[in-house]
């Protein structure tokens, strides 16, 4: 069988088939742990990002220009503090570069989508990271 199957009460359920929750959209996401340079001794400045995402295997009836995901970069000053600044950018399959301005001791990346019928696969996003001083 191509997909996992389960039974209960004389019914057979076909799991993990399709891109939605039985016809309803659901939030899918992946999130990194905090990333720093030089063991967090130095602040970083994030200037731009090249997203690497594919929307292959999305439902066929979706316009290719509307398939999207939200890339959120979050910065924090200290490990025990929450993230204080966020830069969120909508990324389409045609997006080549996102400009942003974030600084902190560490940062994290979250990619999410809430659209119905959209399937995405994350590659290796590239972020322009520069060492920056504390202000």
For every predicted segment, state its role.
Residues 1-135:
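Beta-sheet repeat architectures centered on beta-propellers
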């Amino acid at each position: 069988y191509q997909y996992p199957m389960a039974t209960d009460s004389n019914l057979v359920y076909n799991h993990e088939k399709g891109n939605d929750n039985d016809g309803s959209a659901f939030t899918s996401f992946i999130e990194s742990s905090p990333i720093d340079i030089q063991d967090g001794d130095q602040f970083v400045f994030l200037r731009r990002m090249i997203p690497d995402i594919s929307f292959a295997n999305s439902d066929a009836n979706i316009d290719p220009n509307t398939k999207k995901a939200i890339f959120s970069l979050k910065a924090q000053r200290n490990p025990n503090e929450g993230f204080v600044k966020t830069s969120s950018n909508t990324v389409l399959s045609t997006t080549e570069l996102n400009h942003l301005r974030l600084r902190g001791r560490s940062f994290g990346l979250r990619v999410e989508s809430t659209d119905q019928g959209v399937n995405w696969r994350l590659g290796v996003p590239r972020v322009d990271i520069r060492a920056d001083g504390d202000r």
